């Protein structure tokens, strides 16, 4: 009878520990997801549960709502505040077609379609806000897919990162660009190209500088449409 060389470890002891707290994941799905998550956020706010969240992870259409919530977080004291600063702006977006005009502009004018999508988000929701305008707590994580590595590219106040490429601390990426990257549905709305240089990375995991320049990003749902990974992975 075969014998184990070493005792079998308890699975619970070897799995990465998840920090205690409430994590909220927002899936993709275009405007439908944007509005669904808006209603969910409102109800959680009314119940006093949203304020207890530790991390909020979003993908694609969910990132539109999540980023606006994060930007307005410090102003949300009452239900009326929530309607004024989050619900009404998102409703206005729902009544605006963004993708079709951006596609036409991308075909007829210089620049990529995703750049025109970002410009629309900037005008409608975010103005000049960047990832640094998100609150420290809860942590908002906006997810896209790195087309070059096929893995997750996360964007937050703390960092932008891909475990195959590296990490950039305290990024100043515009919120509109982060949301445009997260919702860059292929093939028409993607890629969103983020201009970066190897020197911007505080930690490097890639073997070649080619992966550290001009990161090509697509809809976060290509990798993980539920936005689960960045809730249980720090």
Regions found by a protein language model. Give the residues of each.
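Active-site gating loop/helix substructures
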Residues: 32, 96-99, 104-107, 134-233
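N-terminal regions that are enriched for targeting/export leaders
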Residues: 2-22
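Patatin-like phospholipase
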Residues: 19-25, 30-115, 120, 156-157
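Generic, well-ordered alpha-helical scaffold segments in large soluble proteins
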Residues: 40-43, 47, 182, 231-234
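Extended, Lys/Arg-enriched charged tracts that mediate electrostatic binding to polyanionic substrates
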Residues: 115-138
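A generic local structural motif
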Residues: 43-44, 127-129, 202-204
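Structural motif
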Residues: 45-48, 132, 208
